[in-house]
Amino acid sequence: MKIVIVNGRGRVGKDLFCEYAHDNRGMVYSISIVDRVKQVALFAGWSGEKDARGRKFLSDLKDAMSEYDDLPRKYVLDWMRQKLDIYEDSMIGTDNIVFLVHAREPKDIKRWVEENGARALLIHRPDVEKSWGNHADDEVENYDYDYYLTNDGSLYDWERKSIDFIDRIRKESWESKI
């Protein structure tokens, strides 16, 4: 089982990367450490729009939830354990599972790497806005990533890059832990 932290500014193609990897390679699962934060934000009146105002709200709420009870991280770890339990109870096993975890902040990425043996991927797209006005989005490049991918071609090119990336890391000898 491998955990890859997926990061990049808004609108660089992270979700599409994860979708392509899942659809073409199987046993690839994507989750964000702000998934539970988004649920709380919707309850609190957030419209669901990821404009600059919405992104700042999510960033601030994530900070508060993390500081209070580490809920964003706990939610992801529990979700992973549930997925692993399904495979451990089957004949398939967990060796080829890849979890793609969306995390923005360097401190969160560092924690996943140190505590769980994750690796970190930065996705870049040359034509994307560089500043969103919140620290979570604006500081994505303040980390020394293990992998870098540039989304600068067609959708087909991006699909190929996602497939090639999954194939590559599955061949590598490192493992993650929960």
Q: Which role fits each region the language model picked out?
A:
Residues 22-30:
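Post-Walker A helix-loop "phosphate-sensing" segment adjacent to the P-loop in P-loop NTPases
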Residues 11:
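Walker A (P-loop) phosphate-binding loop of P-loop NTPases
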Residues 1-4:
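Extreme N-terminal starter segment of soluble prokaryotic enzymes
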Residues 6-8, 100:
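Hydrophobic anchor at the beta1->P-loop junction of P-loop NTPases
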Residues 109-115, 119-178:
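Small-molecule kinase domains that catalyze NTP-dependent phosphoryl transfer to phosphate-bearing small molecules
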Residues 102-105:
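Short, well-ordered beta-to-alpha junction loops that form the rim of enzyme active sites
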Residues 14-15:
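Walker A/P-loop
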Residues 32-97:
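ATP-dependent small-molecule kinase phosphotransfer cores
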